[in-house]
Amino acid sequence: GPTGPTGPTGPQGAGARTISTAAFTSGDTPLTTSLAAEDTTGNLRYVGNALSGQSTNDQVPGAQITLPAADMKYAITLPTTGRLKEVYADYVVTALEQFTRSAHLYARLYTAPSGSLTFTYLPGSDFALSPAVSGNVPAGTVLSGSVMLDAPVSAGEKMLAIVYLGSDTTGDEESLSGVVSLAALVEV
């Protein structure tokens, strides 16, 4: 039969979603984080510089990290104002490690306003990379994880990513060497 009449025009669409990605990588040199025998939270390593001497060798800091001016190169500047929606990280183990206790590698984000050297922990940005490590952890093991957020961010704001080992128990000193990449999705 004949084609029927054209229906009414539908409502205006919501428009395209605009996104920006902030990416971190440890580069060619493996990044090593360790967990002392008496600790349940290990030392920090800034993503972006596996050779940084600015790690904290006792507990992961609370709410803030103040970087020396020379270490600002490990933070990235956000290009747009929007909402941080998701963070994803991969860590590839580069050397065989032997763990006597179960531990997780964690990632966390900090932000600082433009012109500031003091970074504040971004609430809700802590997440564990899986699987947990225990026993023999061979080179080539991939740990990954992500977290969903809805945090406001501003153009010019700086972001710092860290990784650290954590365990529910004390035990032998543990360390993990690998390369890390982390990306944060900002929706405009």
What is each residue range found by the language model?
Residues 1-20:
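Collagen/collagen-like triple-helix recognition
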Residues 15-188:
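Extracellular jelly-roll beta-sandwich "head" domains, especially the C-terminal globular C1q domain
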